[in-house]
Amino acid sequence: RVLFRSEAEQIIPAGEVCEKCGASEWTKDTDIMDVWFDSGSTHAAVLEERPELRFPADMYMEGGDQFRGWFQSSLLTSVASKGCAPYKSVLCHGWVVDEQGKQMHKSAGNGVEPSEIIKDYGADIIRLWVASSDYTVDVRAGKNIFKQLSEAYRKIRNTARFILGNLDGFDPNTDCVADDQLQEIDRWALAALDDLMVNTSAGYAVYDFNKVYHAVYNFCVVAMSNFYLDVTKDRLYCTNGAGRKAAQTTMYKILVALDKIIAPILCFTSQEIWDFMPKTEGMNKYVVFEEMPKAGQYAADEAFKAKWAQLIAVRDEVKKVLEQARAEKVIGASLEAAVTLYCNDTVYSLLNSIPMDELADLMIVSQVELVKGEGGAASAVEGLGVAAAHATGEKCERCWKYSSSIGSHAAHPTLCARCASVVEA
């Protein structure tokens, strides 16, 4: 520090002369003495000289070749001058290579221009590519890789888009319902969200962004799009009051937490979501200023998780039978089906704990019946047999479910009683 700040005459003692030529005027040399010494001294020249920074650094990040370079020279100079390391942690990453794992060279024409990727897919795709990669080894990059990743990005974005669309007109300050008004599947979705918080928090803590990416992707695609959002579509479209508000309350809580989780990676997308999201008092204008959601607030006990794992297993078996019925031209869409579930006492008790209309929604069929005893097609769930037939009644033009109540409202002869009441409301 003294060397950088002081003039030559302040460093050299008065009267000092050159032994060779006898000169007494001194000038500081601006040449680099040693590249590793200079770069290894940056903790003193940068961290300690800038008031907005602090010593030691939270992290030094570089490629693996720097263990004998910058990492080492920084450690040596800091230990020698201060007795401690200049960093709290070190993160080492591999190199970016092409799709075949070869080094990129201009002469080979195998480089990837970030501006072209941004033009085609947006800047968040590059950030998602980094997060989805195992950076501890060499990372492959290429147009095909970014194209594939754009599909994953689209699924995450579409999950948020679907939820936002169904929050239209929802005011979280007045419309949120109490926990005891949520359906069981709503509580399952929030429990899945809590698991996401646990996994992403653990990933961020150790810079394992690949773990964060996979947790978010699986949550959006498997837990949300393929299951929860699919099951709740009918409730959102065809009911008013507590049932719809319960689904919206659940979706709102999910979207708020999910957006905060993806913000460090998909910073532009998360802010776009945040801008369209209904707010409660105290929310920041920018999502990056929000605290990460804390796990535990929606956690479910193991018995509840086991119950819903079994219900999902039953649903999967029903889907297999529906596919067979579709192949045999018995039904077209799943809502054309009436399902009979033959159960032993254990399975009957499990399924009977869910209201029949909610159970039909879970299976995405018009009608469901529980029967104690054996029957139907054998399944992978012990004590369960499944049979499918065409649903009775007529098809509602609004919800597409089959019902005997079609035309019960004179003003709406093609609607079921439920949809007629929604239209009249």
Feature locations, PLM:
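Cys/His-rich finger/ribbon microdomains and the adjacent scaffold used
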Residues: 1-55, 62, 179-196, 271, ...
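Short, contiguous acidic/charged loop-to-helix segments that flank catalytic cores in large enzymes
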Residues: 50-51, 59-66, 241-249, 302-310, ...
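Conserved NTP-handling cores and scaffolds of large molecular machines
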Residues: 160, 318, 325-329, 403, ...
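A generic structural signal for well-ordered coil/turn residues at beta-strand boundaries
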Residues: 14, 38, 86, 91, ...
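Acidic, turn-prone loop/beta-hairpin segments
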Residues: 26, 170-198, 229-321, 325-349, ...
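Short beta-turn/strand-loop junction motif enriched in small, turn-promoting residues
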Residues: 76-81, 327-328, 404
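Structured secondary-structure scaffolds
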Residues: 1-170, 189-232, 249-263, 395-398
